[in-house]
């Protein structure tokens, strides 16, 4: 478990160097799965950045994304960090990120930054993950800085420690590499993740890559989170891929809504008369996800009111680029849609002329018109008393 131990140590280094009261860069929360941090620019505005640690870290870098995609340098810097094959260590990546942002805003580098700088190229351990690899990046204690002499016994102890570290890495290679990231994920979820991973790998080999690395990894994380979710386990909603080879198109089935709503009564009638116990939605993601929102539309049944447009698109600022944030999870989006339907007094149409499903083309057209209208008039924000 040398890699995991090293990651925990590096996280502790970051939290110590950049606490929540640091004037330039702050670690807001940190775990072996995800780090959330804030960069404070010259205008004292906070820029939130998140790093998702992949299961095969440090052989693969973290997945980086930010809520502040309006600043071009952030997107470019995060893309470089996510796609790099060098300096995948979290300390080195944070060093690169802070350096890029300080240069962009013409700010002085934090005095703590050199302590997490990557080593000289010749010193980088090719194994990426041993305890030897990043020792030069750890902060130097004041007591150690004053010691200029190292005796032979100390050198022998260091050699023994290095040897132990190498042995630990061999042991770790025999373990399930997904164990840390897949805790709490159901067998069904693990099977889906395994199948999707194999398909993605084959698509790369065939040169038929879908989407982007960032979008694919974020969607895989969303699948894990969904299969851990109590809402999912309690049957509030279910989800599946429209096609098993396409990670970018999902079916979402909403099974439960507020029991005090007319929509709840309509869903009971739908199940009794038509043997359908859910509202079916299509979620389509593009290669810019999570920076761009998914395109969401109702597929069936036909719904009147509830902010559902004629083509099946949904009138929600959350689903537009202006209202979306890369920090939103897919589950939070699903639950917000359910609340919006109830708030808008959505009703299922049992009229025979509405038995056919909506179409993607009509939904896209109506949503485009919606965006143009709200771009001019803005969005209505209800008072807090209305929820």
Curated annotation (Swiss-Prot):
Biased composition, Acidic residues: where in the chain?
139-164
Q: Could you confirm whether the keyword Endoplasmic reticulum appears in this record? A: no
Q: In which pathway does it act?
A: Protein modification; protein ubiquitination
Q: Which UniProt keywords apply?
A: ATP-binding, Cytoplasm, Nucleotide-binding, Nucleus, Transferase, Ubl conjugation pathway
Q: Where in the cell is it found?
A: Cytoplasm; Nucleus
Limits of the UBC core domain = 214-380
* Disordered: region residues: 117-164
Q: Which reaction does it catalyse?
A: S-ubiquitinyl-[E1 ubiquitin-activating enzyme]-L-cysteine + [E2 ubiquitin-conjugating enzyme]-L-cysteine = [E1 ubiquitin-activating enzyme]-L-cysteine + S-ubiquitinyl-[E2 ubiquitin-conjugating enzyme]-L-cysteine
- Record-level GO cellular component terms: cytosol; neuronal cell body; nucleus
- Active site per UniProt: 315 (glycyl thioester intermediate)
In terms of domain of life, where is this protein from? Answer: Eukaryota
Q: What is its EC number?
A: 2.3.2.23
Protein name per the record? Ubiquitin-conjugating enzyme E2 25
Which gene is the coding source of this polypeptide chain? ubc-25
């Amino acid at each position: 478990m040398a890699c995991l131990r090293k990651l925990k140590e590096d996280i502790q280094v970051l939290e110590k160097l950049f606490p929540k009261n640091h004037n330039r860069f702050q670690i807001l929360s940190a775990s072996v799965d995800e780090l959330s941090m804030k960069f404070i620019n010259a205008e004292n505005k906070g820029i939130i950045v998140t790093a998702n640690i992949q299961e095969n870290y440090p052989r693969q870098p973290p997945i980086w994304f930010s809520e502040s995609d309006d600043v071009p340098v952030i997107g470019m810097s995060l893309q470089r960090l996510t796609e790099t094959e060098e300096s995948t260590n979290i300390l080195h990546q944070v060093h690169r990120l802070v350096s890029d942002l300080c240069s962009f805003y013409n700010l002085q580098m934090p005095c703590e930054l050199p302590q997490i700088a990557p080593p000289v190229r010749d010193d980088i351990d090719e194994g990426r993950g041993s305890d030897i690899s990043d020792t030069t990046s750890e902060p130097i204690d004041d007591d150690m800085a004053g010691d200029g002499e190292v005796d032979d016994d100390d050198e022998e102890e260091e050699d023994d420690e290095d040897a132990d570290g190498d042995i630990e890495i061999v042991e770790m290679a025999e373990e399930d590499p997904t164990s840390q990231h897949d805790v709490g994920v159901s067998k069904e979820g693990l099977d889906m993740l395994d199948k999707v991973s194999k398909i993605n790998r084959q698509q790369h080999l065939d040169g038929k890559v879908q989407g982007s690395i960032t979008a694919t990894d974020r969607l895989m994380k969303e699948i894990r989170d969904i299969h851990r979710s109590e809402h999912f386990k309690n049957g509030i909603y279910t989800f599946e891929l429209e096609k098993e080879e396409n990670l970018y198109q999902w079916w979402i089935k909403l099974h439960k809504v507020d029991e005090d709503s007319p929509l709840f009564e309509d869903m009971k009638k739908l199940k009794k008369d038509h043997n359908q116990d859910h509202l079916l939605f299509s979620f389509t993601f593009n290669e810019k996800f999570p920076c761009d929102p998914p395109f969401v539309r109702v597929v069936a049944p036909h719904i009147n009111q509830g902010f559902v447009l004629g083509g099946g698109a949904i009138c929600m600022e959350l689903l537009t680029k202006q209202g979306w944030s890369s920090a939103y999870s897919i589950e939070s989006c699903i639950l917000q849609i359910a609340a919006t339907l109830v708030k808008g007094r959505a009703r299922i149409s049992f009229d025979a002329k509405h038995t056919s499903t909506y179409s993607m083309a009509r939904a896209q057209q109506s949503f485009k018109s919606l965006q143009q209208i709200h771009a001019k008039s803005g969005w209505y924000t209800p008072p807090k008393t209305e929820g």
